[in-house]
């Protein structure tokens, strides 16, 4: 199992909307994540900085990277573009985090 952590930024006035959209995650998006090896996927929000912290457990890095090519993921990125910082391809701007401790 591979553990990954990363940060993203949601716009300060969009915290509730970000949470609402994830509470209503499309079933086909949920299925696609699992099919691409997501074992556990959690996102936390620091409301003071609007920083999102993502934690992910996956089975295989190469398989996971293929999600960017799926039509449902492209649709999700477009859906989320108006409420968070994104790249020109609408993917969320992310900063990978380095694990420095585990108990």
Curated annotation (Swiss-Prot):
Q: What name has this protein been given in UniProt?
A: L-rhamnose mutarotase
S-S bonds: none
Record: active site: 22
Transmembrane helix among keywords: no
Alphabetically sorted, this entry's keywords are: Carbohydrate metabolism, Cytoplasm, Isomerase, Rhamnose metabolism
InterPro entries tied to this protein: Dimeric_a/b-barrel (IPR011008), L-rhamnose_mutarotase (IPR013448), Rham/fucose_mutarotase (IPR008000)
Q: Does the keyword S-adenosyl-L-methionine apply?
A: no
Pathway terms, separated by semicolons: Carbohydrate metabolism; L-rhamnose metabolism
Q: Which Gene3D superfamilies match?
A: 3.30.70.100
What family does the database annotate?
A: Belongs to the rhamnose mutarotase family.
Q: Which GO terms describe its biological process?
A: rhamnose catabolic process
NCBIfam families the record matches: YiiL_rotase
Q: Which GO terms describe its cellular component?
A: cytoplasm
Protein's job = Involved in the anomeric conversion of L-rhamnose.
Outline the subunit composition. Homodimer.
Residues annotated to bind substrate:
18, 41, 76-77
